[in-house]
Amino acid sequence: MSGPLVLAVPSKGRLQENAEAFFGRAGLNLSKPGGARDYRGTISGLDNVEIAYLSASDIASQLARGTVHLGVTGEDLVREEITDADKRVLLIDTLGFGGANVVVAVPQAWIDVRTMADLDDVASGFRAQHNRRMRVATKYINLTRGFFASHGIVDYRIVESAGATEGAPAVGTAELIVDITSTGSTLVANGLKVLDDGVILRSQANLVASRDADWSEGPRESARIILDHIHARARASKYREVRTRFKGCDAAMLTEAHNRFGVVAPFGGPTSSGMLTLHCPPAQIYSLGSFLRAHGAETVSVASLDYVLDRENPLFARLEAFLRS
């Protein structure tokens, strides 16, 4: 008998709150039967799923080892921690929170340094003048090496940062940094600026699957159910349901509504009594309502959608294709 599917989520702070809220909106309610300090949890109604509460960096490591099936973590940690990440894990879906950029930042006093090409010139001149390589403080060692290599920069050495990376140039432990930032305000406060082409990665929280986990029948079915919930919620959030009834509706009018307002008719054209159900992007609701009334509709009602369940689930299809490849 196969073991449970293990879903790893961040164990503290805003990331944990956002992850739990994300799953909750999809009808997947995470709970800790052992209390708030427990590092194991469950999903209500899914017996074959175990929640593991880990740090975001540990989640990336456990995905690489295959000890968890699915995990919520930042793409920056996936790319940094996992060698050949695209072969070993699948970024199933972005989750809409935890957004931040991994960037190259230099002192604002370096007024002539705006690009990576400028930095390459500075690096060469720095070594000639000081007889040592320029120091780059960072926690993102692998991302830094790859990005600098792509720009042909070799005259530098990495100083691994264990604390507040943005303070390294000010205290003299590095000339520049590679760090993650969401607004850039902390960098500015420390006298730093991001190079014009210095964004290494635009990261956010992702739902990630491990190739090396045990994907036997039980965990695979649990993953299908979880991804079905997530896709149904995501699909619903893109639309509002519009209902109306009038005799003047025909295929040409539906085609025009689709082309102008992006609507879909999930149940086909109007019924024999003229009832019509459409799914419409929220920003187009008023325009669609005006269009329908102009064509003879007396009343148009609009309702929010909780879930839209399709026969096919592209998220699970992506996972299946990845595991077969």
From Swiss-Prot:
Cofactor(s) this protein requires: Mg(2+)
GO cellular component, one term: cytoplasm
Catalytic activity: 1-(5-phospho-beta-D-ribosyl)-ATP + diphosphate = 5-phospho-alpha-D-ribose 1-diphosphate + ATP
EC number: 2.4.2.17
Keywords associated with the record: Amino-acid biosynthesis, ATP-binding, Cytoplasm, Glycosyltransferase, Histidine biosynthesis, Magnesium, Metal-binding, Nucleotide-binding, Transferase
SUPFAM superfamilies: Periplasmic binding protein-like II
Pathway in which the depicted protein is active: Amino-acid biosynthesis; L-histidine biosynthesis; L-histidine from 5-phospho-alpha-D-ribose 1-diphosphate: step 1/9
The protein's role, per its UniProt record: Catalyzes the condensation of ATP and 5-phosphoribose 1-diphosphate to form N'-(5'-phosphoribosyl)-ATP (PR-ATP). Has a crucial role in the pathway because the rate of histidine biosynthesis seems to be controlled primarily by regulation of HisG enzymatic activity.
The name this protein goes by in its record: ATP phosphoribosyltransferase
Organism ancestry: Bacteria, Pseudomonadati, Pseudomonadota, Alphaproteobacteria, Hyphomicrobiales
